[in-house]
């Protein structure tokens, strides 16, 4: 059975992962069939590059993505695009659906960043209030 999974590379405390198609029996960093992408979790923001054609090929021949690889494929929108193709949508519909999906993802990211900024500000305010009351 072929799996789409992550293969660790990089140096100590600075991981870079290759997204590979590999035999399920092979070790994590061992023999693989093909490199189909790259994931850099330490980059700000995280960097994911995937060869869509090769991922579609491997999924088409029955490769199973691991949960982590599947979440990365979902984050890039590849699984959503493949699902639209499978449903028989036209190319124009797929392009418009993917544009809407990109907008939803960017809105979700902006909302998450706003929440994070509010929490950070609330924490600073609480620390300032605690310091003022301590004096």
UniProtKB/Swiss-Prot annotation:
HAMAP family: Ribosomal_bS16 (MF_00385). Pfam families: Ribosomal_S16. GO terms for cellular component: cytoplasm; small ribosomal subunit. It comes from Prosthecochloris aestuarii (strain DSM 271 / SK 413). Keywords: Ribonucleoprotein, Ribosomal protein. The gene is rpsP. GO terms for molecular function: structural constituent of ribosome. InterPro entries: Ribosomal_bS16, Ribosomal_bS16_dom_sf. This is Small ribosomal subunit protein bS16. Belongs to the bacterial ribosomal protein bS16 family. NCBIfam families: S16. One of its GO terms (biological process) is translation.
């Amino acid at each position: 059975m072929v799996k789409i999974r992550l293969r660790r590379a990089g140096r100590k405390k600075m991981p870079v992962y290759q997204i590979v198609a590999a035999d399920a029996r092979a070790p994590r960093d061992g023999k693989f069939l093909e490199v189909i992408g790259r994931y850099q979790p330490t980059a700000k923001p995280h960097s994911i590059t995937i060869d869509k054609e090769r991922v579609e090929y491997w999924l088409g021949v029955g490769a199973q993505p691991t949960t982590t690889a599947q979440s990365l494929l979902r984050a890039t929108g590849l699984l959503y695009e493949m699902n639209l193709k499978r449903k028989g949508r036209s190319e124009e519909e797929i392009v418009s659906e993917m544009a809407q999906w990109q907008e939803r993802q960017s809105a979700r990211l902006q909302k998450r960043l706003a929440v994070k900024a509010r929490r950070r500000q609330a924490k600073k305010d609480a620390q300032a209030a605690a310091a003022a009351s301590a004096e």
